[in-house]
């Protein structure tokens, strides 16, 4: 573990740690990651970056970061978070956030989300509570999407916490990782009596309406439009990559990178970007630059 100095120490929320997991195909820290870390710094009294790609932390990021942990790119995010969490002092924090760089943002102030009343009593929480399974044959289990996990002291000091992270093993299969760790963590926590919650709760949200997706339909793009019509009617869906407008309205200040890079649901990406520019002050150049470089 390489300790990094800081040039300044801003006012912070008491006893909160953030473990941020980074991956980049070229081993770089993209400007949108710089932006994210600058936003997280005032919100944490301890900020650790775990990189599955870079061997060194750029000098420009050193003042923002308390610890840097380079590691091999194995085990997806949960193995990386396991290693990052192991660097924290036990019992030193009331809340730990595990966040990855699969999202652009924060697009707007994150502090209201962290203080949201609907999350106040949760032991395990996140930006999105979903019940999407890895296949239609699997049961639908409410779970916190793992790109942003918040965990509070009652859970942090439990036997479940220690047992879960001790048993995290690097998995080669992404679907198995999701089932065993993303879904499995929430399922085990709920079964043990811990409360789980999401700022946007897809498990209680109404179905996607035709009126909501209508602006994304176009006779000029019939195949994309048909894909959107077909997929938006399925339940459950991935709320982070389909109903991004609902997430913003719920106070979730993020946009999934995969929504723009893959566009699984067939959204009008030009409209997404226009809406982003209209609703937020986020620098769209960060998104355009990242997509040009990484595709």
Each model region followed by its residue ranges:
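ER/Golgi luminal nucleotide-sugar-dependent glycosyltransferases, focusing on the catalytic module
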Residues: 1-295
């Amino acid at each position: 573990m390489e300790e990094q100095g800081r040039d300044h120490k801003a006012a912070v929320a008491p006893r909160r740690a953030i473990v941020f997991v980074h991956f980049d195909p070229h081993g770089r820290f993209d400007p949108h990651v710089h932006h994210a870390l600058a936003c997280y710094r005032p919100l944490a009294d301890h900020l650790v970056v775990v990189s599955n790609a870079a061997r060194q932390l750029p000098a420009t990021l050193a003042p923002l970061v308390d610890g840097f942990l380079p590691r091999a790119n194995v085990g997806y995010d949960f193995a990386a978070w396991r290693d990052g969490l192991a660097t924290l002092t036990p019992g030193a924090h009331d809340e730990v956030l595990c966040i990855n760089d699969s999202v652009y943002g924060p697009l707007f102030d994150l502090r209201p989300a962290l203080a949201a009343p609907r999350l106040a009593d949760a032991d395990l929480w996140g930006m999105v509570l979903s019940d999407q399974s890895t296949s239609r044959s699997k049961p639908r289990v409410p779970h916190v999407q793992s790109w942003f996990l918040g965990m509070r002291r009652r859970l942090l000091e439990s036997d479940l916490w220690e047992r879960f992270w001790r048993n995290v093993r690097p998995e080669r299969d992404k679907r198995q990782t999701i089932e065993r760790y993303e879904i499995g963590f929430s399922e085990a926590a709920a079964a043990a009596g811990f409360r789980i919650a999401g700022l946007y709760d897809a498990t209680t949200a109404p179905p996607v309406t035709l009126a909501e997706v209508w602006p994304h339909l176009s006779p000029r793009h019939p195949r994309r439009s048909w894909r959107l019509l077909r997929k938006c009617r399925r339940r459950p869906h991935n709320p982070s990559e389909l109903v991004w407008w609902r997430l913003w309205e719920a106070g979730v200040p993020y946009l999934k990178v995969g929504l723009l890079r893959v566009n699984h649901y067939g959204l009008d990406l030009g409209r997404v970007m226009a809406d982003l520019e209209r609703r937020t002050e986020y620098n769209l150049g960060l998104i355009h630059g990242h997509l040009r470089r990484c595709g």
